[in-house]
Amino acid sequence: MKIEGKFTMKAPIQQTWDFLLAPGTLVSCIPGAEKMEAVDEKTWEGIVKQKVGPITIKLNFTQTLTELEPPNHVKAMGLGSAVGGAGTFTQETIVDIKEIAGGEVEIAYSSNVSLVGRLATFGERIMRAKVNKIGGQFIQNLQDKLKEELGK
């Protein structure tokens, strides 16, 4: 399943980059995130809890940054499993940040997600709707947190 989009924010590119890559940012912006810990400079482990269809799923995952071109490009690979054996997932995400007019940045993202097990039985339509909803919440949270950070 491929999910992609882009949005703009009024923020300096370097501060946006630093903010996006801070583990504390991710845990505060991802809906349902219960934990996010840095394993090393390029790897995070986390737990996210989400309601999908009729069930609530808790996911353990590891995210590793595989390409870094500060402050414009990052590629990350993720691997996770649902607590209780409801399935596994893999994910590859690319985020590109570029400066545009008026002190704004454009953040473009593309993510390929593969689901196996009970997670996959919900079907792409249900999963895509859920992922899009979470993505929208993440973007709003990110914009709010970055505005708050810039105001300090």
Over which residues does each language-model region extend?
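Beta-strand/loop substructures that line and gate deep hydrophobic ligand-binding cavities in soluble
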Residues: 80-129
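Intrinsic-disorder/low-complexity, polar/charged segments enriched in Ser/Thr/Lys/Arg/Asp/Glu/Gln
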Residues: 2-8, 43, 60, 73, ...
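A conserved amphipathic terminal alpha-helix motif
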Residues: 118-152
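Glycine-rich portal/gate segments that line the openings of hydrophobic small-molecule binding cavities
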Residues: 37-81, 137
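Hydrophobic pocket/interface hotspot
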Residues: 16, 20, 26, 65, ...
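Short strand-connecting beta-turns/loops that link adjacent beta-strands
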Residues: 12, 41, 70, 100-103
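Hydrophobic ligand-binding cavity/cleft-lining segments
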Residues: 1-51, 152
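Hydrophobic/aromatic beta-strand elements that line small-molecule binding cavities or substrate pockets
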Residues: 5, 34, 60-67, 78, ...
